[in-house]
Swiss-Prot record:
Record domain C-type lectin: where: 33-155
Species the sequence originates in: Bungarus multicinctus (Many-banded krait)
Tissue expression profile of the protein: Expressed by the venom gland.
Family recorded in the similarity comment: Belongs to the true venom lectin family.
Primary residence: secreted
Record's keyword annotation contains Transmembrane helix: no
Annotated glycosylation sites: 134
Name listed for the protein in its UniProt record: C-type lectin BML-1
Signal peptide: 1-23
UniProt xrefs under InterPro entries: C-type_lectin-like (IPR001304), C-type_lectin-like/link_sf (IPR016186), C-type_lectin/snaclec_domain (IPR050111), C-type_lectin_CS (IPR018378), CTDL_fold (IPR016187)
Assembly, per entry: Homodimer; non-covalently linked.
Molecular functions per Gene Ontology: carbohydrate binding; metal ion binding
Length: 158
């Protein structure tokens, strides 16, 4: 009976909402968007440790992937609200082959790359992980050394 009640309420909410309701449940302090849940973490970690931290939540969790300017704007507002002045933020994009071939940790398509001017540059042949840059209002990206310590943005399928 409870399953039918939840399903019925979800359908009712979808019909009553102007945008439609997303019928999944994110943990209370996570941001729901496009069937996924997102959370920014202020603890500074290397890119690899941040990816490992995201994966510990459950299968299907990774550093976040962004696929449109609308996503970038929404996440810039979300990150700015939680990390005022706390530095750049790791996302799940990396050049694993070190040949300017950028890949997301969730294996989604690489279809949106809002790089800062003159980026990516693999500076000193040592920058292969991607961060959202704070002084661009968290709207543009830079490649950086994967060992740098940064806050990070996780995404999970719940």
């Amino acid at each position: 009976m409870g399953h039918f009640t939840f399903t019925g309420l979800c359908l009712l909410a979808m019909f009553l909402s102007l945008r439609g309701a997303e019928c999944y449940t994110c943990p209370i302090d996570w941001l729901p968007k496009n069937g996924l849940c997102y959370k920014v973490f202020s603890k500074h970690k290397t890119w690899f440790d941040a990816e490992k931290y995201c994966r510990k939540f459950k299968p299907g969790c990774h550093l976040a992937s962004l696929h449109s300017n609308a996503d970038a704007v929404e996440f810039s507002e979300y990150i700015s609200d939680y990390l005022t002045g706390r530095g750049h933020v790791w996302i799940g994009l990396r050049d694993t082959k070190k040949k300017y071939i950028w890949e997301w940790t969730d294996r989604s398509r690489t279809d949106f790359l809002p790089w800062r001017k003159n980026q990516p540059d693999h500076f000193n042949n040592n920058e292969f992980c991607v961060e959202i840059v704070n002084f661009t209002g968290y709207l543009q990206w830079n490649d950086d050394n994967c060992a740098a310590l940064r806050p990070f943005l996780c995404q999970c399928k719940y």
